[in-house]
Each structure stands twice: as structure tokens, then as C-alpha cells.
Amino acid sequence: MAGTLDLDKGCTVEELLRGCIEAFDDSGKVRDPQLVRMFLMMHPWYIPSSQLAAKLLHIYQQSRKDNSSSLQVKTCHLVRYWISAFPAEFDLNPELAEQIKELKALLDQEGNRRHSSLIDIENVPTYKWKRQVTQRNPVEQKKRKMSLLFDHLEPLELAAHLTYLEYRSFCKILFQDYHSFVTHGCTVDNPVLERFISLFNSVSQWVQLMILSKPTAPQRAGVITHFVHVAEELLHLQNFNTLMAVVGGLSHSSISRLKETHSHVSPETIKLWEGLTELVTATGNYGNYRRRLAACVGFRFPILGVHLKDLVALQLALPDWLDPARTRLNGAKMKQLFSILEELAMVTSLRPPVQANPDLLSLLMVSLDQYQTEDELYQLSLQREPRSKSSPTSPTTCTPPPRPPVLEEWTSAAKPKLDQAIMVEHIEKMVESVFRNFDVDGDGHISQEEFQIIRGNFPYLSAFGDLDQNQDGCISKEEMVSYFLRSSSMLGGRMGFVHNFHESNSLRPVACRHCKALILGIYKQGLKCRACGVNCHKQCKDRLSVECRRRAQSMSLEGSAPSPSPTHTHHRAFSFSLPRPGRRGSRPPEIREEEVQTVEDGVFDIHL
């Protein structure tokens, strides 16, 4: 740091600005780059960038009166450094850009071409894409044709695509997003950070749903094993953020309670799982993770939630200013904040060592917006292994690792609602990918045979005839796009999970799945779902939170569907497979384990 400044004792903004100017020599060489970069990155924490630009303009004008040519050129070197190091500020802040243009115009009027040439504000690239909630960047096609069936993806391939998706989303986060989160304590008016958080949550939920989508314990154990190896590959890629999401999904209560499932997981996998869980545990303020991160070389993706907690803790523990008049900023706090934010900023300077398949990304981007509540996940877990089921007698006595502490205040953020135009764009790209990979004969239409192949990725698609609107025996791109748009809007983002109720008589009392009270009488006082058999009172239909769990089978989208519960916020989603539960008995609290089905079991999707 500059010798004349003692940041630990505090200093004014003007003193720190002067110290940054004096850090340059007349040739533009900076003697204290850490001080300069820290102040230019951190100044919005204390004053708006427009005020800083005004101070620089004032210093330059004052140096002209004092005939201090050295101060003039040093000021211009600082402005050049600012534009070079943080160009997004100038593209996204028109007021700031205009002030710098004003300084450049002043230099031109004076005929000072040498100083003016140092300030290149006209060629700042656009960064408006950083403010868009979703953005698809072109990526190189892989030479070999990658399978679009999620079950066919090797752990490394899946880890690479997860890394690519999260990295692309992370690169849009700017300093102002971190500052807003720390000052507000939440993601209010912060859609970019909120979207990244929802992606983290989506990965965690997707892991749970992929496990719970399998009807038998050995199959679920196989999915757990697969995701443990995905987590291992994420560690090799030094992607700790997605590693935390995957481990969190594996250790969630809806999965950890599946005792029979865990009895089929090998001891070797359990040992690996325990090691990965221990790495991201909160013990010792995430000491294991911090040590591993510090030892990383090259690309690394830190756990954003951990570092956001650090920022919030600093904000609460230390004041921004050391005096009531707010003239002397807290330099010690600034240095600590900078060390955290600089670590996060380094992520965007190094690209991950992965390549992504555009078609697979399009499918994943659509499936990402599936949303399930904690209660819905737990209900599905109870369907798989009801509470009353006795523990299995098995030679394998493996138990799942304890669930790592969850960053509740961070991961519980609601999913931001995408606008219609963005949703249409994703659906169209997804449909293009489907036709490019599954239209075998290349005639621009999907035949019934090709449709059955597609169901490997979209098991909750309705019957072929529901998509074939003109009934010509094949499905066009327009018909498939129309189907997804219609389904998403009509079902409130819950495709494949909506009950198909009809009035039902019962010769004996049955319990309402919502209120648990008996449905009495034989005069059609109750409703029953044709697909899954769930019963409820007519007045309870709209409040029923249990979703229809029948497997992909013909069910018209025009059938009756309950209105979404006012207590739940539904977000758009697209249909993906969950296996069908077995027929319920007369005793409602429990659901018998379904029989193994010979039809396709569905593929990963639900929630990447």
C-alpha cells in the first residue's frame, strides 16, 4: 500500500483517491496496483461512481490552474486504468460514461492530444448481456455426437455441462449485485444473483428428483452412485459451488431417509460420499473447503453461498465509516471486503476446462425451470419408502453421510419468473435440438416411431395425438412448440403433475388426501383422480398439494385441472418423468411401493 496512507486508521475518500493517483508515475507505470485496484473496485461501497468521476475532473481542472503537468498525466493514467480494469461500469452506467467523455472533450479543447489519447471511452464493449437473466452464448460443437439421454451421460460429461451452465450464469454477476445483496440481506431487485441462486437450488432438487424417480431401491441406489461420481468429477474440475449443490441434494432429508435404498449402495461409494460431504461441511467455518480452495491452481469455482455469508458477516460486524460524519472510511473493512470480492472476480478471468454440447444445453435450460417444494419432494420420498416399512435385512450396513448444514438464508430464495419472450426462445431452441437429433429421416417431422424415442427425454409428454394437432400422422416443429407453450401456460408450470379429477361414488368411507377427514355417503360428494386414484372433497380440490404421480401415459391437457393453491407460488416448468405410484389401499396415510414396471423408467431430467 502507499506509504503515506494508513488504511487501518482510516482515511477520507479524497485522501485515498490522491494516493491512487500518486501510485502512477508519469509514464503510466503503477507502483501500487493492489491499492489502485482495491479502491476502483470498492469505491461504490462508499460513493457513487459518478461522484468519483466528478472528483477526478475537479482534480484535473485544479492541476491545470496549478500548472502541475505531472498530476494531470497521472490523473489520466488512473482514468485509463479504471476503464481498462472495469469496462462494464462505463457501459452500464451512462452518466459515468458521459462524465469521462466530458473530461476527454476538455483535453481535446486544450489541444492536449497526448493526455486525451490515454482515455479511450468510445471503444468500451457492450456488457448489456450481463444484465439479462438468461443468455445463450455460442459454443463449439463437439466432434462426436453426444447422447441427449441423461442416463447415458458419463459423470464427467454431466459435471462438465453443470459447470458450464453455472459458470455462464456466474459471469453475469457484478459488484453491484454483491453490494445489493449485502446491504439488503436478500436478493430484492437483484434478478441476476437471484437467477444464479435458483440454478444452485435447481441442481440440488434435480438430484433428489432423479433419485426418487426410480421405482425400486436398487435403481435409486444406482442413481445415488452415479451422482456421487458426478460430485467426484466436479471436485476434479475444482467446481466447489456445484459440488455443494449435488452433495446437498444427495444428503437432503428426502433422500437420507431412504434406508432400503442406502442398503444397496456399496461401501466404497459411501466412503467417497462421506469424504465429499466432509469437504463442504460448515464445521470450522467451512475450514476444509477453504483449505482446499486455497491450494487450487488454475480454474476454480468457489461456493458462492459461503463467500456471501462472509460478506454479510463483515457488513454486520464492522462499520463502513469510522466517524459519525461519515468522512473517514474504514480501511480495514475495505481490505477484507476486497479480498473476498477479488477471489470471486478471479473466477470470470479463467474459463473452465470444459466443452459443452449446444443441443444438450438447450434441453437442460428448459428442464432447469422445473420447480418442486420441500413438501412435494418429501411426499414423493414417502411414496418410495413409507414410514411404516420395516428396515431391510441386508448384509450391507451402509448409512448415508449426515446432511451438510444448508445455507438456508441463501438457498431458499424464490425462483425468478422469466418473461414470456425468454421462455419462448428457450422452447424454440429446445425443439430445434429435438428435431436435429431425433428426426431420423430428416423430413422435418416427427413420426410415431421417432416420438417414442423422444419420450426417453420427455416421459411426461402427452399422447402422440395431442401433439399432432392436424392429425396428419406426424408432428411438426410448430406443433411441438405450440404444445409446450400451451402446456406451460395452462398448467401453471406443472406439466405432468396435474390431477384428472372426476366425481366418484364410494360404498365405503375413504379419507380426503388434503384434510384427512372421511368422505361419507354415496352421492358423489368426493372426487377421484383417474390417473393416480387420489381422493378428496370437492371443496378441497383446489387446496390439494399432492401432485399426480402417474407415469407418462395418455392424458389430455384439456382435461380438468385443479387451480393452483394460493399458498404456493408456481413457476414455469416442463414435463419430465416421475414413476407412477401403485394403487392405494383403503388406508390413506401410507402408499404401497409400486411394482417394477417393464416400460421405460424415464431419464434424468426433471431439474438440472
Curated annotation (Swiss-Prot):
Instruction: Give the binding site residues for Ca(2+) 1.
Output: D439, D441, D443, H445, E450
Q: Which residues carry this modification: Phosphoserine?
A: S116, S117, S147, S554, S575
* Alphabetized SMART domains for the sequence: C1 (SM00109), EFh (SM00054), RasGEF (SM00147), RasGEFN (SM00229)
Instruction: Report the stretches of sequence that form zinc fingers (Phorbol-ester/DAG-type).
Output: 498-548
Q: Where in the cell is it found?
A: Cytoplasm, Cytosol; Cell membrane; Synapse, Synaptosome; Cell projection, Ruffle membrane
According to the record, mutating L234P results in:
Homozygous in a thrombopathic calf; heterozygous in other calves
Q: PROSITE patterns from the entry?
A: EF_HAND_1 (PS00018), EF_HAND_2 (PS50222), RASGEF_CAT (PS50009), RASGEF_NTER (PS50212), ZF_DAG_PE_1 (PS00479), ZF_DAG_PE_2 (PS50081)
- Notes concerning its domains: The N-terminal Ras-GEF domain mediates association with F-actin.
Q: Which PANTHER family match?
A: GUANINE NUCLEOTIDE EXCHANGE FACTOR, RAS GUANYL-RELEASING PROTEIN 2
Could you tell me what this protein is called?
RAS guanyl-releasing protein 2
Encoding gene, per UniProt annotation: RASGRP2
